[in-house]
From Swiss-Prot:
It comes from Coccidioides immitis (strain RS) (Valley fever fungus). Keywords: Cobalamin, Cobalt, Lysosome, Membrane, Transmembrane, Transmembrane helix, Transport. GO terms for biological process: protein localization to vacuole. One of its GO terms (molecular function) is cobalamin binding. This is Probable lysosomal cobalamin transporter. The keyword Membrane applies. InterPro entries: LMBD1_LysCbl_Transport (IPR050854), LMBR1-like_membr_prot (IPR006876). The lineage of its organism: Eukaryota, Fungi, Dikarya, Ascomycota, Pezizomycotina. It is a multi-pass membrane protein. It comes from the Eukaryota. The chain crosses the membrane at residues 8-28, 46-66, 93-113, 144-164, 189-209, 313-333, 350-370, 376-396, 421-441, 509-529. One of its GO terms (cellular component) is vacuolar membrane. It is found in: Lysosome membrane.
Amino acid sequence: MALLHSTLIWIVYAIVVGILSIVASTFVYIYQTPRDRSAAVTTVCIFTLTALLATVLLLPVDVALVSSTTSEFGRRKDWATDHEVEKITYSLTVVYYFLYSLDAVLCLLIVPFTYFWYEEYDEVAYEDDGRFTRKPFWGAFKYTLVFILLTIILFLVGFFVPVAKDRKGAHFDLDYFKRLLTENHGERALTFALGLLIVMGIIVYVIYSSTGLAFFPISFIKSSPSISSPMLSANIESRLEENIERQRQLEGRCGGNPDHLSSKDRRELDSLVREERTLRRRKRLAEASRGQGRNFVIKVWYKLGAVFRPIKLLGGLLLLAISVMIWISMLLTCIDKAKNSVCKQKCGYILGKINIINPVNWVLVEAASVFPADYVIFIVLVLHLFTSSVVGIATIGIRFLWIRLLQIRKGHTSPQALLLATVMLTLITLALNYSISMIVVPQYATYGPQTFCDYPSIPASAPLDCSKHKEYLKPCSELANNPAAKAVCTPSVASTFLNRITLNFPFFGIVDFWAQFVFLGFSLIVLLISLFRTPRFDEQQMDEDAEEAEEEGLLAASGSRFNAAWQDTTGRTRDQRVRFRDDE
């Protein structure tokens, strides 16, 4: 029965990972530009995002497996011997170490290599005969050597860096904290490396995720005007008519010869010609966005989008409620940690016992008794925060200080920007792993629905049984003094690993904890600004999109004409020419 239950849990996780790959693929294909699409870049981005989300969404599996060892009456199940529990935690530890190591390698090595490879490949592309060259790979490897060296240094520092030496105090006498102190140098190296990556991710998380958490639901509620709206389309048509009429007036003055115009009128005429070109681009873009000239299915799709626009408003209100619930839960836990942490900054504000109940944590703990109900809620929570991070990156862009370097937009994101956004999402997801487990749902992430029986048994050696005294059932915690808690409660592997980081390297825990208050402040400011700010239509961006679409159309037409002319001249297609070279 226990084996069947564990197998079903892992099967659910495998299905979720498959769904995550679809989510990651959807994100990549929505944002990347079709003109510069690269199979290698697309594959790396999808695989990286899938691995990251799989790491975060392993937590409900962790909680379900360790919680399956206890009964609803606060006792260990008959099959849950110490050996069996150790087998469960060991298998989870192996999976976590594999996923965390994979995330680190992808972030520090694979994605940078792909970035440099695309830069080199973009310059070299193909030789004239259509075969690959080795130059892009060697050039990318040369630049990636710097990241390889940094990775080696990072793990060497983690291998030899001293852990927290201030181990005096009542909190270090607890068995739970003794187990967290790392003595293995290999574990210490991985712990240090991930702790540093989480701190780096916290910085990105505070800036982008806080913005997205507030702006994501508001973007549904207060959508910016669409170019396909009748008012804007009518405005474009009116301005185009005025422009043409003014050009006729100027041309009428000179009898069709612009040289007879004054310099002022010639400048005005040139300006009107440029404006007419821009307005015609906007008109074509507006017609395309309304589905004009497209097939019946596309037109129906646009009509349905207009009909179901009120549902989008309701969806925005629902997302806003989720964001507010997450914000309140984070605030309550942060206050609880700041006030009731057993060791404060000495152990990175580890919370030994939940003193203030937060709503998200309560819902997940209650739902955890009926797996996979908690998994569904947890997936919604993670995807909401992940999507908010994507929206934050798209809103702010990739910047250095106040200078925008690259822009993340639907259908207009270059491969370089997509790879950099993937690195940022990697760091953000590692930070999310800490924030969700330690701040949003601390009790659920540590012990889940596990309880122990605090009923005094007579004789003392008899097993505790609360089947008839449910009022004595208490949630498991690190500070429980009853020996029954130590015999029954099993913390999740994820919480053990994250608490090990903050306990062995308190500086990381201090930064991660206090950054949550900055996150809450930023998100509140962005929410207030978004509520009172009217969305504006970006005409400059629309002109750039229209110009880009026109260039793509011209390039496609030019390429077709060139290929046709070449085939007429040579008498054979390019494929035939390549086969002829191969035969030679």
